[in-house]
Amino acid sequence: VSRKITIVGNGEIGEEGAAAIAAADFVIRFNECRSYAASPGRTDVVAVCNTGRPAKAMLSSDTWRTHPAVMEAKEIWSVRDPEKFAGLRAPLAVSHPELGDFCDDYTSHFNAFCKDAGKEHIVVEKVIHEAVDAALATFDPAPYVVPSSGMIAITATFRRFPEVEIGLAGFSHSGWEWHPFAAERQLVDSYIANGRLTRHPADTSLSSSQGA
């Protein structure tokens, strides 16, 4: 029996996306799971930024710890390899001094949270991060700091589930200025074109170039 995975971003979820999430055998959400209200239900993984302010905010929030998606998830994926981010600290101090706490590592805190909550904690290895950087280079991205957690999670899902049908919902490819969202959209579109991914746009009347 073929399994269906849906990766759920925090952008707008349309009817098609909500239906895909409801029909999925495995659902991956992100960070604060902000799109959960529009697509409640199954959650197997919450992928988190385990460095910097997002990590600190989630770990210090009872709202996050008791969020229904976080409660249900069997696994937490930390998308930022501690060794990779330790290596970024010195160059970023020069190029982006305003990101002084960006590489602060909270992996051990997520480890403790998962241990207490009976969840598996998976740290996505830097080889995945570096594979994403290499794939994005094809699209000549503007200078960026790191790929988005969504792009890391998509690539990690490919590696873990090589033959499984994977759909995307709630991906707007927009947000923090130092993620390479334009190149990420092009990369995702290339995966869709070769049949590796399916996109469930928020508005099915939009063309693929404008959709989620």
Q: What does each model-found stretch correspond to?
A:
Residues 1-212:
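Metal-ion/cofactor- or nucleotide/acyl-coenzyme-handling active-site neighborhoods
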